[in-house]
Amino acid sequence: MISDIQIMVALFAALFTGILALRLGTELYK
């Protein structure tokens, strides 16, 4: 059974990696 804390951590991790990938993509695009 997945707890709410694990879901929140997973969401924050996905959001963090998404922002990181977006910044890296824009840097490489330049």
From Swiss-Prot:
GO terms for cellular component: chloroplast thylakoid membrane; photosystem I. The chain crosses the membrane at residues 7-26. Its main location: plastid. Pfam families: PsaM. Belongs to the PsaM family. It is found in: Plastid, Chloroplast thylakoid membrane. Keywords: Chloroplast, Membrane, Photosynthesis, Photosystem I, Plastid, Thylakoid, Transmembrane, Transmembrane helix. This is Photosystem I reaction center subunit XII. It comes from Mesostigma viride. It is a single-pass membrane protein. One of its GO terms (biological process) is photosynthesis. InterPro entries: PSI_PsaM, PSI_PsaM_sf.
